[in-house]
Amino acid sequence: MHVIAVDAMGGDNAPQAIVEGVNQALAEFKDIEIQLYGDEAKIKNYLIANERVSIVHTDEKINSDDEPVKAIRKKKKASMVLGAQAVKEKAADAVISAGNTGALLAAGLFVVGRIKGVERPGLMSTMPSFTGQPFDMLDLGANAENTANHLHQYAILGSFYAKNVRGIATPRVGLLNNGTEKTKGDSLRKEAFELLSQEASINFIGNVEAREIMSGAADVVVADGFTGNAVLKAIEGTGLGTMKTLKSAIMNGGLKAKLGAFLLKDRLKGMKETMDYSSAGGAVLFGLKAPVVKCHGSSDAKAVYYTIKQVRKMLDTKVVEQLVDAFDPKEEVN
């Protein structure tokens, strides 16, 4: 039985969306138990009674505008912190939150702890592509500044996840750069390119450009945290803007536009489903001693359900235990 700690108070739509997502997951997966951390009375308004769910009451929560590290240290009874503490104490196997990203990263690093040998855990998300084959990308903002050694480790981490969790036998790893030639990029990218070229444990295919990653150029895309976060937000903004523009064109385009949309209804629905990033789950702070996963702040119940499904897969495959062995065979997860 997998025990998953869930911060019920984090995110724009908490606790309703969080609890409703938990209800869906419990109904489908019989091998999970959920610990909900937060305001018990508010949680019970949406919770369907189940013997595999428990509530740990707390009135304290971390707000979106709280300074991450200070919040973790001062708000010891916050729902997010208690969830991370449960993982540290082995009362839970993983923790999920849609709350303050920086605070969750801090809780992951300072409470759960990183795997020995991993210099900087990376924030990684599985992204949709136009081909229908998702790709993993990291770092998405856990670290604003990185060295070439960090990017080297991100490539190993991302490849490991793609292989063991997503089932890709030989993941193609690409380095995000401003050109595909090996001579492109600044000193960071050039040094990282050399390190990745010499890494025998990964299938490094060279540099990839931002315009190529949505077209299936690589299974794993490696970037420094600043660049990765900027690209992620550009992708999200472009997707939302495209759908909004398309909807406006249909609604304001008269009878012909509406008729065309009706005829293309199934195609448009399929396109929307292909580009729905929520179905891939949340962003993993990979390189820690247990799964710490961030849902989007605006997550609905569907996104929460898929994140729990993702965490269940991580626990089923024992990817963290395997990662510990890969980086330091002598260390035990604790």
Curated annotation (Swiss-Prot):
Any Gene Ontology CC annotation: cytoplasm
Single annotated GO MF: phosphate:acyl-[acyl carrier protein] acyltransferase activity
Gene Ontology biological process terms from the UniProt entry: fatty acid biosynthetic process; phospholipid biosynthetic process
Catalytically driven reaction(s): a fatty acyl-[ACP] + phosphate = an acyl phosphate + holo-[ACP]
Key words, A-Z: Cytoplasm, Lipid biosynthesis, Lipid metabolism, Phospholipid biosynthesis, Phospholipid metabolism, Transferase
Any single Pfam family the record assigns to this protein: FA_synthesis
Biological role: Catalyzes the reversible formation of acyl-phosphate (acyl-PO(4)) from acyl-[acyl-carrier-protein] (acyl-ACP). This enzyme utilizes acyl-ACP as fatty acyl donor, but not acyl-CoA.
Domain of life per record: Bacteria
E.C. code: 2.3.1.274
InterPro entries (UniProt xref): FA_synthesis, Phospholipid_synth_PlsX-like
Cross-referenced SUPFAM superfamilies: Isocitrate/Isopropylmalate dehydrogenase-like
Involved pathway(s): Lipid metabolism; phospholipid metabolism
Species in which this protein is naturally found: Streptococcus thermophilus (strain ATCC BAA-250 / LMG 18311)
PANTHER family: FATTY ACID/PHOSPHOLIPID SYNTHESIS PROTEIN PLSX, PHOSPHATE ACYLTRANSFERASE
Subunit structure as annotated in this protein's UniProt entry: Homodimer. Probably interacts with PlsY.
Gene3D superfamilies in the cross-refs: Isopropylmalate Dehydrogenase
Entries under HAMAP family matching the protein: PlsX (MF_00019)
Similarity-based family: Belongs to the PlsX family.
Subcellular compartments: Cytoplasm
Protein name per the record: Phosphate acyltransferase
EC category name: transferase
The keyword Transmembrane helix belongs to this UniProt entry's keyword annotation: no
Gene (name only): plsX
